[in-house]
Regions:
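Active-site-adjacent structural elements that line small-molecule/cofactor binding pockets in enzymes
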Residues: 1-167
Length: 167
């Protein structure tokens, strides 16, 4: 249907530590990570013959008109995220995720995922990735019930705030 771009399709590869950087940096074009670790970015850049292309951080947020509603939603659908990459990589099934996250409290989620209608707080949650040298940050809006409302009410103003943070 479409022609492939000249030079091929760039490939982004998720990494979590020194071993994955050493193994995948020579193979991939872009780094993807879920933790704002500057050592991943610098290690990727050093391990690639062409240097750093893009370093893409991925971070969950949970916008809702009410902060408690956002916390409840993030706890219900994303509480596993607080365990970090090493825990997530070792959980092969939904049952494993449930078991590993069964004792995660709502306040734990609120401390690790920016939740609520405060766009400044949501934007600030990206700052650690910028400080770590990431070139791009992908926001994951938790939950499906509020996606359209998020897009209609918050996405544009949030994007403006994020652009203002960019170096």
């Amino acid at each position: 249907m479409w022609d492939a771009p000249d030079g091929g399709v760039p490939i982004g590869l998720a990494v979590s530590g020194e071993r994955s950087v050493e193994r995948f940096a020579p193979l991939g074009d872009h780094l993807i990570a879920v933790e704002p670790d500057g050592e991943l970015v610098s290690g990727w850049s050093k391990a690639r013959p062409a240097g750093l292309a893009r370093a893409i951080g991925q971070i969950p947020i949970c916008w809702a008109p009410d902060r408690q509603q956002a916390i409840d939603l993030a706890h219900e659908q994303f509480r596993w995220f607080g365990g970090g990459w090493y825990v997530n990589a070792d959980l092969p099934t939904p049952a494993g995720f449930d078991a590993a996250s069964q004792f995660v409290r709502k306040e734990d989620v609120a401390g690790s995922i920016a939740c609520g209608p405060d766009l400044d707080e949501l934007a600030e949650s990206v700052r650690p990735y910028l400080r770590a040298g990431f070139t791009d940050v992908a926001l994951v809006q938790v939950g499906d019930a509020l996606q359209q409302e998020f897009l209609d009410k918050a996405a544009g103003p949030l994007l403006d705030k994020l652009r203002a943070l960019a170096p």
